[in-house]
């Protein structure tokens, strides 16, 4: 289970960092994997920081910070709790594809579409089509392998925690187990988590803490070379032609095309079921161990040093991984003699399945044994001196911290080819005498380090006037020694107006009013290391050979990298400005928060483009430089209401919405003109561009009239002779671009990409909102979250609108109503597809024309989703006392229900994921929490 988290909009032009936040677990920096591996029952609370509030964490906090505090022990008798959860995950939706009969009909209509060339009258063509008797038989066939192989995946989670302690020491311990199945094929994932910690008061002025945590995860799945992973398997099953079974009478069948080819490729021989049921396997084991400790001394015993504390902390993390793989050659079969009058069917009463009718083939599923091991070690040390003290109405605090962190990572990979059929996965179980036998070993290693100094001063007067100044200095070894260090200051201030004596809360009905502002500078080092120095690599061949013996046929050469060197590359800078207002009304029942932010990215990593700046004669690619500039800005509004009705009923609602945008000030501008290229001082979202569709050619007369009326000479690279009914009609908008004047000529009779128009001013939704609400009555409660986004249009996915007829691939169900110029006949002169000139969709034969981006495929990008909803009930405590239980709560939760689907015929939806890829999932869980 993983979480994709975005706190602030991305403002990068280059570099290699993804716009993900920094994760901090119990005060120590952690990676996203450690965050995802946390068990929910280990977590006490999660806090999100952004803008200047995140500046204390330096360069890595440019996209915000997720602070996680895990559970700690509390003073009291031992308290034991159990949490159990059972659930299942399923696809938000599966793509709707053509059934067997419609596939055959659409295939025929597309295959015989070029009526101008009289292909329809060709006997050779008619034999290659599905015959009428075959189509009739296909009405009873529908081998939907995606529907067959896809299933809801079960999950379960169990955890047991214990906590307690005295004034001297508190403790917490917990262990949890999580298990998840896959939605497609054979997949099993198991993970154990453990965490134990103790906080001890060594003396009145000294305390220490120690925490040990870790997890062990194991994944088992089939070795699958040709499937291409989860996404590849999903696409393969989705596109499987629905009249071909994957197995008959225990034989794994592969589709050999309309002509029953005898020399198929491994991709054509691929059979998902055969791979899933083979012994080929991938086993992955991952272990993570963390040790955190701290020692704090309080100078509260001194009248003059009271408020001063010194804290030393240390964190050590070790992660190891091991993967074992085995891939063999799997037997699959081609049906030599197929059924139907055209010889295209795989199932029928007249078909036999035996050694004479089945041809045996081998599917190469890797044919190798593999081992890989990796290990990463990291540590973080902090020494922090803090001071906080109240002097009357004056509150002063300060902090100085030194942080040092280092990490190293290495892996080792080995493989052997040609495992023996009876292999148990041992290295000796291979045929080293086989032709092409190979043994390979590779290894990699990397290391990194950071050193930081942090200083912060806070002052407040009467809790009304709040001020903070912070300075952080970071060093990164990614830069040349003279550029290691970056200095990043920040300032913030706040004023609680509602605490002023002159502020009348009764008259204004405002219980709380605060204004705040902040300004800070953050930096990033998101470039590859060693860009500042010249590096060389060794090429084992292509070198000269002088004076060696006749058996020497290779010689090593020294090779320069593909990218240039830039010794001046240094920290980039983001100037972050934030202004906010916090309010509470009507006896604090209503709240409002308004935030404005403006971020100016300067000296950002970017690369110049175009031969005018970097001629081809240089011979290498330009290195990143610090010249990019981008401004990102936005506003966020939050409105909340909470109240009680009577003694036992309460409810709350919170609405959050916002808007964000950006302007590109400087980057590596494209030399050639392009409609959607970045433009100085305009947003990076260039909108959606494509042709203006003005109809569909439904006859040759319409084609002639169009070419004559607009004096068309070229239509997407085609002359009139190659334009046919069933193609979309695009408008000739303008002529060619004149670089000298920066303008376009008038319509020139050539329809090409120069005729693009702006289909949508936005390619992604600029507006969004979230509605959270909840209700409780005694021991019963409901909470939910709705989300929506709007403000843009999108296009039907390229892979969906550019689908073409293929004897090996099915197509979306939307093509069921496809243009057919005239009746299509089989070899017996029987109509297999009736004329359909009033169809909604063009003919997929011409996907290169019809699949181009155009207004024909324009759909709304708006989304509305029920992101999650939980119904909970706590059993009355008087019932539980009898059996010694302090509390018991049941909850039912479901995630992600979508309401809008603008896609044609509902065949797919944007909220379901990318067409042809593993879909987004919804989840339902039933849980119970018991405390003793």
Language-model features: locations:
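Conserved small-residue
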Residues: 81-136, 642-761, 803, 810-815, ...
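Extracellular/periplasmic, surface-exposed regions of secreted and cell-surface proteins
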Residues: 125, 191, 197-206, 211-216, ...
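Short, solvent-exposed loop/turn motifs
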Residues: 29-30, 252, 259, 395, ...
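Extracytoplasmic gating/loop element in the C-terminal half of outer-membrane beta-barrel translocons
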Residues: 270, 274-277, 344, 789-889, ...
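Short aromatic-centered micro-motifs
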Residues: 23, 459, 745, 775
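Short, T/G/N/S-enriched strand-turn elements that build extracellular solenoid repeat scaffolds
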Residues: 35-38, 881
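Membrane-proximal, glycine/serine-rich, low-complexity loop/turn segments characteristic
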Residues: 1-22, 28, 35, 53-296, ...
